[in-house]
Amino acid sequence: MKEYQTITEISGPLVFVETDEPVGYDDIVEIELSDGETRRGQVLESASDYVAIQVFEGTEGIDRDASVRFLGETMKMPVTEDLLGRVMDGTGQPIDGGPEIVPDERRDIVGEAINPFSREYPEEFIQTGVSAIDGMNTLVRGQKLPIFSASGLPHNDLALQIARQATVPEEEDGEDDEGSEFAVIFGAMGITAEEANEFMDDFERTGALERSVVFMNLADDPAVERTITPRLALTTAEYLAFEKDYHVLVILTDMTNYCEALREIGAAREEVPGRRGYPGYMYTDLAQLYERAGRIEGREGSVTQLPILTMPGDDDTHPIPDLTGYITEGQIYIDRDLNSQGIQPPINVLPSLSRLMDDGIGEGLTRADHADVKDQIFAAYAEGEDLRDLVNIVGREALSELDNKYLDFADRFEEEFVDQGTDTARSIDETLELGWDLLSMLPKDALNRIDEDLIEEHYREDETAETVEA
């Protein structure tokens, strides 16, 4: 450990120190102020004669007489199964007043991408209890499926709903008591104090905290801390998944705040900016986070990611959602129009996509009719959406009887299937049965994407009769 008192410049969250020998990139630093206070930081840039340090607690009050100690190691997360039920700040320090954490080991937070040769293809279903996801855009264990939202939309409510409702089928059915434990890692970045209180109230009220580890980085915390929080969360998830055989769902919100922190740090370092001022390495940086999801051959556990981001200006071509879409395996869209109609959660299934869905559904996974029901609902709802535009021109009276049924289907799909509130958890059977109720509004010959045997087994004749009477 070497100590310096050679601070040359303090700029925003950065402290620049003259050194007489090279210092390792990402090394942890302690800065001792004249009043004895100690702050932690991390080496952000290292040259032969100086280093740039990002200070986690902020640089206010630091002067040139402060002592800087380089600890010679990168940041590590103390991990143990006892982290479940605990609440940490954005740097991994407990803030819940609980006992001191006694770690089983300390792990480097940067982590490593899973060796492609050792990856197992994601195939098992995760039940979120949300019909628009489970039925139409299924989440699969080991997948990374982002939620694209926008300012003012209830993505936090959806995140909390998934955190308390998510299960794996084998855990729910009790078929396999070993290797099927389910845990949630919740990493919040740049949230307000009000949002933090809302999160904690919900976790404690519903009992979801018992199977969760929560990391909270607040809006008034230093931006550099936001770059640490998701790595702490993922390091904890990897330990629980690959050492303790948990199926871990990692919810990260809001990745836009994370990227804004990257931009702020890049500006402080006077880096050459990329698109819209974001650093040119943002794609690589995001990939380092998202690629930590997956399954490893020979291990029971899995890491599944559900990152949430708000699209600036509702623009899905903005660099943050654009780059996220390249790396991840689909997206769930939160829709402003559906939200204005009072539909909760306001998920628009048409632009949403789960690229791994087809491998995680079907007989032995969800139900044999799942894929056909999903395809037919997509087709019918898309037809109803197109007809809504036509109705604005010619009116409903000019449409055929079948066209009017498609319009009614689209309305009921939003009101009954998508709109389930934030406190209702539906099983996959309930979701698919509701899908059949809606599809039975249409005549059998319109169900051209479903196997005839499945139609005979599940079609409700009474639904068609009720529609005709109406």
Curated annotation (Swiss-Prot):
It is found in: Cell membrane. GO terms for molecular function: ATP binding; proton-transporting ATP synthase activity, rotational mechanism. Keywords: ATP synthesis, Cell membrane, Hydrogen ion transport, Ion transport, Membrane, Transport. GO terms for cellular component: plasma membrane; proton-transporting two-sector ATPase complex, catalytic domain. Its main location: membrane. Pfam families: ATP-synt_ab (PF00006), ATP-synt_ab_N (PF02874), ATP-synt_VA_C (PF22919). SUPFAM superfamilies: C-terminal domain of alpha and beta subunits of F1 ATP synthase (SSF47917), P-loop containing nucleoside triphosphate hydrolases (SSF52540). CDD domains: ATP-synt_V_A-type_beta_C, ATP-synt_V_A-type_beta_N, V_A-ATPase_B. Component of the A-type ATP synthase that produces ATP from ADP in the presence of a proton gradient across the membrane. The B chain is a regulatory subunit. PANTHER family: V-TYPE PROTON ATPASE SUBUNIT B. Belongs to the ATPase alpha/beta chains family. This is A-type ATP synthase subunit B. It comes from Haloarcula marismortui (strain ATCC 43049 / DSM 3752 / JCM 8966 / VKM B-1809) (Halobacterium marismortui).
